[in-house]
Regions:
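Transmembrane alpha-helical segments of multi-pass transport proteins
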Residues: 102, 373-377, 397, 424-480
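Helix-loop junctions and terminal segments of transmembrane helices
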Residues: 62-80, 144-145, 261, 265-301, ...
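Hydrophobic alpha-helical transmembrane segments
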Residues: 51, 120-127, 153-203, 262, ...
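Transmembrane helical elements of multi-pass membrane transporters/channels
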Residues: 16-31, 159, 163, 180-199, ...
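Hydrophobic transmembrane helix module of multi-pass membrane transport proteins
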Residues: 61, 90-233, 240
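Interhelical loop/hinge segments that connect adjacent transmembrane helices in multipass membrane
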Residues: 1-9, 195-239, 279-295, 415-429
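Alpha-helical transmembrane segments of multi-pass membrane transport and lipid-handling proteins
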Residues: 25, 29, 70, 89-115, ...
Length: 480
């Protein structure tokens, strides 16, 4: 054990992870601190335009570089990694050039046909945003290859400072909503420039290439553009579907309210979810070879679901009050979106790490098909909800439909490793009912006596009961 720990510290693995994780936390903290100022400078419709813009850029970015950048850290020989960097950079520049050409000739026509006319004044920012976002993604993969983990960490902090600084400065001088869009572009540009400076300083970008190395690299990692790219596109389309759908059928205000609720409610997932997912993959792979994957996954599912369901739903019930105080009175309606989204978001905190079982169990093809199914069901939910001509109700139906499919996917993958589906559904139902029972009285008090001291006491008691009961339950079952 001592030898192992020495090797770990010698390789600086823990040090590198702490750089990235710590920087991500600092960057998120900066975003949260600045958000109350931005929410008072910009309107919900301004944030709606930003959301639609970032959705379009995010989807297009999945095509850039043909996804070869994901293979940069993989080759053992440096010459093949450099060949991949060259290929993905050239493909990225060609794709962005094509976007500029399309924007010039048919950009306005396409945006009008897909009901995104709100982006027409900012048409040329779309390919520019794809350029800086793709450049940062490629630069980050090269930095991982070169071990520039401290640089990656600092660029995330720099992105938060420069991006939010640009949004504040441009908003104060009345550049709305352009300030939000330019701030997003500035953030990505600052990140990639920092990594490129570190690479130039180390002289790791000075190299020669051969056609043979390029050809071998392209052929060996051809699955990235053939399969991985389309999986990523489907995933990103599913993630951004509500924003685009709300902009199609309702208003930019609805998009802004939804985006604010979803982003704030998903903060625990963005901060904790990625770290939990990485740990789960490492421990799950080990458990697979030990023959304990089923018991480990069941315990992980029970713990993560319990620790996410009650806190996130409780936070969502308080969202109308918290958003009005934290963001300003114009954002109170965003709290309603948080309430209807809460079951889906709470389950997503468990769902995201558990989906790593597809990779651990070698079920990549099933994951692809299930991702398509989830996207189609989410689209159906939004479309059916639109029949009532109410954006909040549309989001509610979307949330419930998504929740059902996510539960089905987890039941499927857990049953595939030896856990009965009935048992998975029983655990899920019991955790949902536990949260509902603990939050029933606090919700009633909040609805009718939200200014009473007794309401505060009821919420505190509910939280104490949740902590004590689950600590006792987990200790009794030897889960902790």
């Amino acid at each position: 054990m001592k030898i192992f720990l020495k090797k770990v510290f010698k390789r600086n693995i823990i040090k590198n992870m702490s750089y990235v994780a710590g920087a991500s936390f600092v960057a998120q903290s900066i975003n949260i601190i600045i958000l109350p100022l931005l929410s008072r400078i910009y309107s919900p419709s301004d944030f709606g335009i930003l959301s639609v813009y970032t959705s379009v850029v995010g989807i297009l970015t999945m095509f850039t570089g043909l996804r070869y950048y994901l293979a940069i850290p993989l080759p053992k020989q440096e010459k093949y990694a450099r060949a991949l960097l060259y290929v993905t950079s050239v493909a990225h520049c060609v794709f962005v050039f094509m976007l500029f050409v399309f924007a010039y000739f048919v950009g306005d026509y396409i945006l009008d046909k897909i009901r995104l006319s709100s982006l027409q004044p900012y048409l040329y920012l779309i390919p520019f945003g794809v350029f800086v976002t793709g450049a940062y993604t490629i630069a980050t993969q090269w930095a991982v290859r070169e071990g520039f983990f401290s640089t990656i960490g600092w660029t995330r902090i720099l992105q938060a400072i420069c991006g939010n600084g640009a949004k504040l400065a441009l908003g104060i001088v009345g550049c709305k909503p352009m300030g939000l869009l330019l701030g997003a572009v500035v953030a990505q540009g600052c990140g990639s420039s920092g990594i490129f400076r570190a690479s130039i300083k180390k002289k790791s970008l000075k190299f020669t290439l051969s056609r043979t190395d390029i050809k071998r690299s392209v052929i060996k990692y051809r699955n990235f553009p053939i399969y991985d790219m389309w999986t990523a596109v489907i995933n990103v389309v599913g993630q951004n579907m509500p924003q685009l759908f709300l902009s199609f059928y309702y208003s930019l205000n609805a998009v802004g309210f939804y985006t604010m609720a979803a982003s704030l409610l998903s903060l625990p997932i963005s901060i904790v979810g990625a770290a939990v997912g990485q740990v789960f993959v490492q421990r799950g792979a080990q458990a697979k070879y030990d023959g304990t994957l089923a018991s480990f996954s069941e315990k992980a599912y029970r713990i993560m679901l319990t620790l996410s369901m009650y806190p996130i739903i409780a936070l969502s019930l308080l969202a109308p009050i918290l958003f009005s105080f934290f963001l300003g009175t114009q954002w109170e309606k965003s709290g309603l979106y948080a309430i209807v989204l809460s079951p889906k978001v709470a389950y997503s905190m468990t769902y995201s790490p558990l989906c790593m079982l597809y990779a651990i169990g070698g079920r990549i093809k099933q994951s692809f098909y299930h991702e398509i199914l989830l996207t189609l069901v989410m689209l159906c939910g939004l479309y059916l909800g639109s029949s009532w001509n109410n954006p909040t109700f549309s989001v509610l139906v979307y949330s419930l439909f998504s929740l059902v499919i996510m539960i089905w996917r987890i039941a499927y993958i857990l049953s595939d490793i030896g856990i009965e589906r009935y048992k998975v559904l029983r655990i899920t139902f019991s955790v949902f009912m536990e949260a509902a029972c603990l939050l029933f009285l606090p919700s009633i008090m909040l609805l009718f006596y939200h200014k009473s001291l007794y309401t505060v006491l009821v919420w505190i008691v509910s939280g104490i009961i949740f902590v004590c009961y689950n600590y006792y339950k987990f200790c009794k079952r030897h889960i902790l």
